[in-house]
Amino acid sequence: MDSAAVELKDVRAFSVREKLLAYVELTKPRIAFLLVLTSAAGFYLATKDSFNTILFINSMIGISLLAFGVATLNQWVERDIDPLMERTEKRPLPSKRVTPTEALVFGLVQCAVAEAYLFFLVNGLTAVLGLVVIVGYVLVYTPLKTRTSASTAIGAIP
């Protein structure tokens, strides 16, 4: 008799609320808030003449979207090592509340929307700096975290 191998997948269904909370968790909102707070301080300190409220609000929205996207992509890159650490094993990807494809698409869309938002509603320089942050954090800092302690200094640049 032949025996067939059967692959079992985790088929637990999550409620809409659980799924939405998992997506919010992917964005690391507390860290994003701190990034926006420091960006707001920098914006204020860089203001020479009158404070441009509309530009300020648009900048903070764009930076928020960028921070959310980068945090999501960071977790996507670390999806294979997060289940191995107690501190990270309950994140949305290791706990299978979000699939890797969902996280990747979510992160890329957030970053693309952030870049377009910054380019059209803030300025080109801010959008370019946002792109530098995406590349530096997701493609340089995140992979280096497991290879060298120098990654801490690199991660502090953006």
Give residue spans per PLM region.
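Cytosolic, membrane-interface loops and tails of multi-pass inner-membrane proteins
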Residues: 2-18, 77-98
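Membrane-interface elements of multi-pass transporters and channels
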Residues: 47-48, 80, 84, 88, ...
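Membrane-embedded alpha-helical segments that form the functional core of polytopic membrane enzymes
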Residues: 37-41, 45-79, 87, 128-139
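N-terminal, positively charged, Ser/Thr/Ala/Gly-biased leader segments
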Residues: 1-30, 34-40
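Hydrophobic alpha-helical transmembrane segments
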Residues: 43-47, 114-122, 140-143
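Multi-pass membrane catalytic core of lipid/isoprenoid biosynthesis enzymes
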Residues: 87-128
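Interhelical loop and helix-boundary elements at the membrane-water interface
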Residues: 19-31, 92-103, 140-158
